[in-house]
């Protein structure tokens, strides 16, 4: 969770003209970087046809450092035989814990426990959770395996992780033990012990806007928790339902109509998680009816995000396949209502966004997914499926309170009853989000793999955005996966007070000299503390800021 910044701090933060002046060319006084970027990555066995362990990469992320952008360390995972969901399900035998995890989520910021900083990387396919001591990013001990698939009795498919007030971690599990439906939440302590498993499925939910792929109409049963956010002051945990894991693991095309996707948001009382979700909300379908049902606006709610300031109680959610951003002004209301406020486009891959700490901007990664020649590619406007980051100014939307005018855009329907064209991002009301800036991340690798920027991390001390161009690819498992990978680059941008997103050209690959750091390393490359293991797939990122020795850190009034 990001912390609020004061108006004074915001006033001196980066502008496009001042970036060079605000980043001194010299390194820190002691020659050591003060900011690092942790990258949770899996081995990309397709380059050398050899499966190497998954790992945590550490990139120098201090703009003042002479090694800025260089991979300066890696951390290994504990290798425990037969510690993988594949073993538990009888799909494989002897799989060690440090391979075939499919590196996915970890906590968004390091957690401090007894003076040490920890990240908890988790495997989407292995259902393993590791704990990495990143207190000294240049000297990270082997990350122990703290939670295995066998410790969790009901669920599998690990996704998001947040910290609770009691310092426990709450984890979303996308599916059931056999990677079908339903999923749930699991609470663990910092030692990895399972405290409780919470069912997300609850019969009697709202009727799905149309029956699911398998004909289910009760959304209460279609629990696929993926995105998650938490507001301690409101006492709520909010989760979004993405997809039945088995239906996306066997995908044969990015636009496969057989994907069984989620269309609901679940609201939980943090003090009574064992009671299950208190509210289940079906997001609206809008006026568009796509010929491919999985590209309708609500399909595949990948992420959910809450506003931060006390005066705001809003929630956003975004659909990966539907390509749409939704907003509800008060998630604590008895029956929250979401509205479609920004339509990127069908199949555009609206991914894991963040709301800035001051509630000023929403930064949305657009993975694009569709590529030239695919059905619906750039159907509605030029650049619809460009891979990019978008900064949306949400001030007027939040200021409108419950009296929101912004809504879904108009559409042109064809004689077959399906949408021919979507006219704009929304209805153009005065309170609609306004695009303040964007950063194009198109590349041959992104188009060829039907991927793009999926996850972003924010350094709230410098207002920098790091983006990973990778989603999920399951070729090491003998599965087609999501058919949406990425070019495996990690890119850096500055967010200015005006909402501009400016690529940091100094954050460049140490081998090629090109902007962005490529994890597709040649087999000749010697990874620090790892060896010559070739290319890797970066999914999640987290900034690590070394403690300020003065002990001072300015925070705002969170009013």
Where are these regions (language model features)?
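Structural signature of eukaryotic scaffold interfaces centered on beta-propeller domains
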Residues: 29-33, 88-115, 157-166, 218-235, ...
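Short, conserved, GDST-rich strand-edge loop motifs in beta-rich repeat architectures
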Residues: 36-51, 172-183, 239-262, 364-385, ...
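Beta-propeller domains
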Residues: 40-99, 111-114, 120-145, 221-401, 407
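Short loop/turn segments immediately following beta-strands, especially the blade-tip
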Residues: 58-67, 131-141, 189-195, 256, ...
């Amino acid at each position: 969770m990001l912390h609020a910044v004061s108006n004074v701090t915001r006033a001196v933060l980066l502008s496009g003209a001042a970036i060079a002046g605000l980043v001194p060319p010299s390194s820190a006084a002691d020659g050591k970087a003060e900011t690092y970027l942790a990258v949770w990555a899996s081995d990309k066995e397709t380059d050398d046809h050899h499966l190497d362990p998954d790992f945590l990469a550490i990139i120098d992320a201090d703009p003042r450092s002479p090694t800025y952008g260089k991979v300066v360390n890696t951390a290994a995972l504990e290798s425990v035989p037969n510690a993988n969901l594949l073993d538990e399900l009888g799909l494989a035998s002897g799989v060690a814990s440090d391979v075939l995890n499919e590196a996915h989520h970890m906590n968004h910021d390091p957690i401090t426990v007894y003076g040490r900083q920890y990240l908890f990387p988790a495997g989407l396919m292995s259902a393993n959770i590791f704990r990495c001591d990143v207190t000294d990013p240049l000297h990270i001990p082997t990350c122990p395996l703290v939670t295995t698939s066998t410790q969790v009795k009901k669920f599998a498919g690990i996704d998001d992780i947040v910290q609770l007030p009691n310092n426990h971690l709450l984890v979303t599990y996308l599916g059931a033990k056999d990677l079908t439906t339903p999923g749930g939440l699991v609470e663990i302590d910092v030692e990895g012990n399972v405290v409780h498993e919470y069912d997300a499925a609850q019969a009697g939910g709202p009727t799905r806007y149309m029956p699911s792929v398998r004909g289910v109409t009760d959304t209460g049963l279609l629990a696929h928790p993926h995105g998650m956010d938490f507001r301690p002051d409101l006492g709520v945990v909010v989760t979004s339902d993405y997809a039945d894991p088995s239906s996306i693991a066997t995908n044969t095309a990015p636009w496969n109509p057989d994907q069984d996707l989620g269309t609901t948001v679940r609201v939980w009382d943090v003090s009574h998680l064992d009671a299950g979700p208190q509210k289940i909300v079906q997001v609206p379908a809008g006026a568009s009816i796509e010929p491919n049902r999985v590209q309708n606006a609500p399909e595949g709610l990948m992420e959910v995000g809450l506003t931060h300031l006390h005066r705001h109680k809003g929630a956003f959610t975004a659909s990966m396949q539907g390509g749409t951003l939704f907003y509800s002004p008060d998630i604590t209301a008895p029956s929250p209502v979401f509205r479609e406020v920004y339509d990127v486009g069908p199949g555009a891959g609206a991914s894991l966004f963040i709301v800035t700490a001051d509630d000023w901007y929403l930064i949305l990664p657009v993975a694009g997914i569709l590529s030239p020649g695919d059905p619906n590619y750039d159907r509605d406007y030029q650049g619809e499926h460009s891979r990019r980051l978008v900064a949306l100014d949400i001030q007027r939307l939040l200021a409108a309170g419950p009296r929101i005018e912004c809504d879904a855009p108009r559409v042109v329907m064809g004689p077959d009853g399906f949408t021919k064209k979507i006219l704009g991002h929304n209805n153009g009301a005065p309170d609609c989000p306004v695009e303040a800036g964007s950063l194009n991340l198109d590349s041959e690798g992104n188009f060829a793999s039907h991927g793009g920027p999926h996850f972003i991390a924010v350094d709230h001390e410098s207002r920098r955005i790091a983006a990973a161009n990778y989603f999920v690819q399951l070729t090491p498992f003998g599965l087609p996966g999501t058919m949406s990978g990425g070019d495996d680059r990690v890119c850096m941008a500055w967010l200015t007070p005006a909402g501009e997103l400016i690529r940091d050209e100094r954050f460049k690959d140490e081998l090629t000299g090109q902007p962005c750091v490529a994890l597709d390393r040649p087999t000749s490359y010697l990874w620090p503390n790892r060896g010559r293991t070739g290319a890797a797939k970066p999914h999640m990122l987290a900034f690590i800021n070394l403690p300020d020795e003065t002990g001072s850190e300015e925070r705002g009034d969170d009013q």
